[in-house]
Amino acid sequence: VYALVFRYLLKFTPGPGDPSGLDVFALWVLCGLLPWLFFANTTTMGMRAIVDNQGLVKNVLFDRETLIFGFVGAQVLTFTLELSLLLGLLLLAGNMFLPWLPILVVVVACLTVFTAGVTLLLAASYVYFRDLQYLWSICTQLGFFAAPIVYPIGLLPDRLQTVVRLNPITAFVTSVRNLVYDLRGPTAFDLTVMVCWSVTSLLIGLGAFSRLSPRFAEEL
């Protein structure tokens, strides 16, 4: 559906992969869509992890963070399976991305840490503010179009490109696509952005969760 709408109706054409030469728009979209779906689905569903397990939270003494990390871990397994299927399709299309797999693992690890941090912050906040799920739904819809997932960033004016690059997910999407579709490494800028956002997200998420968690049982 994305391939039909954005390539044939809206005429978004990223061009062949550089230097891979691969020109399959559906695969190009999937390379950006899968990392985004992992982030969006994990944060959207993960924010309910504390509330949905309130019986456990109120009656059992344990580190509540384990609920979040356990959920994120389960989503990582799903993402790994989906990514493996995509990599299989890319191999069938002739893309020999195998030398880039170690860097792909690093990028996925950074994405996982970033996602875990955001999920921790959302889950802790959701206990106190239940309308957060609706606000976050709007944010993810805006975030989808504020990242080059279904369109090449080169189509945007320079000023708008700068704005899009401020979206944390842009670096992850671009890096995954560069590695397995274009067959080239991520830029130094994207690597720096991914590491900085991952560390910052986790620190903020853990800090907020630690501060808010003592009152979870009372609020629930």
What annotation goes with each model-predicted range?
Residues 1, 22-38, 102-117, 141-145:
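Small-residue-enriched core segments of transmembrane alpha-helices in multipass membrane transport
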Residues 1-41, 45, 187-188:
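Transmembrane helix-boundary elements of multi-pass transport/secretion proteins
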Residues 3-14, 64, 70-139, 184-207:
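Alpha-helical transmembrane segments and their short interhelical loops
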Residues 19-22, 45-59, 80-89, 134-151:
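Hydrophobic alpha-helical transmembrane segments
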Residues 33-42, 46, 76-84, 112, ...:
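Mid-bilayer segments of alpha-helical transmembrane spans in multi-pass integral membrane proteins
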Residues 38-65, 69-76:
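Transmembrane helix boundary and interhelical loop/hinge segments in multi-pass membrane proteins
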Residues 131, 210-220:
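Short cytosolic juxtamembrane segments of multi-pass membrane proteins
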Residues 142-192:
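Short hydrophobic, aromatic-rich alpha-helical segments embedded in or entering the lipid bilayer
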